[in-house]
Swiss-Prot record:
Species of origin: Burkholderia mallei (strain ATCC 23344)
Any one biological process term the GO annotation gives: dUTP biosynthetic process
Stated name of the protein: dCTP deaminase
EC number from the UniProt entry: 3.5.4.13
Residue numbers binding dCTP: 112-117, 136-138, 157, 171, 181
Gene: dcd
Similarity comment: family membership: Belongs to the dCTP deaminase family.
Pathway: Pyrimidine metabolism; dUMP biosynthesis; dUMP from dCTP (dUTP route): step 1/2
Organism classification: Bacteria, Pseudomonadati, Pseudomonadota, Betaproteobacteria, Burkholderiales
Keywords: Hydrolase, Nucleotide metabolism, Nucleotide-binding
């Protein structure tokens, strides 16, 4: 299994629509010149952006977080260019990009150091072979202070690994529960 380069990422995005919308280079500044958290194609990965749809954890209903019986009332929906995550709290978002992962590919997604150095941890599970959809992003604010997440800017990097043989059963073959997800998707069992 080998990591894939910027050339491969560009080719797969342009010829097979692996990433839409696709940014072939790394963007480090907004059109007006202000600095942003970078996104787009890097040497051996793709820096994904966060859309402007968020679900922020709240304790209004004082429920227990149960992944088998998740209470949607545990979140407050928010739409905007900047999401403020309360201290020691958590938020969900989704990517701007829609992904179509080839059958021979598995991805690993890692948070960007810009956020990690501020105590904001980004968690995303691997994109499995033949999975497709918008990625649900998980943000943990590990600090005792409120923390900002910027919509339409980079939040994590996706690394693409290609196997030397095709898997017997892909995510699509087994009817994965998050296949084709569109918005911020809550836990399913």
């Amino acid at each position: 299994m080998s990591i894939k380069s910027d050339k491969w990422i560009r080719r797969m995005a342009e010829e097979h629509k692996m990433i839409e919308p696709f940014v072939p280079d790394q963007v480090r500044a907004a059109e007006d010149g202000r600095k942003i958290v970078s996104y787009g194609t890097s040497s051996y990965g793709y820096d994904i952006r966060c859309a402007d749809e968020f679900k922020i954890f709240t304790n209004i209903n004082s429920t227990i977080v149960d992944p088998k019986n998740f209470d949607e009332g545990s979140f407050v929906d928010f739409k905007g260019d900047v999401c403020i995550i309360p201290p020691n709290s958590f938020a969900l978002a989704r990517t701007v990009e829609y992904f179509r992962i080839p059958r021979t590919v598995l991805t690993v997604c890692l948070g960007k150091s810009t956020y990690a150095r501020c105590g904001i941890i980004v968690n995303v599970t691997p994109f499995e072979p033949e999975w497709e959809g918008y990625v649900t992003l998980e943000f943990s604010n590990t600090t005792p202070l409120p923390a900002k997440i910027y919509a339409n800017e980079g939040v994590a990097q996706v690394l693409f690994f290609e196997s030397d043989e095709v898997c017997d059963v892909s995510y699509a073959d087994r009817g994965g529960k998050y296949q084709g997800q569109r918005g911020v998707t809550l836990p399913k069992t």
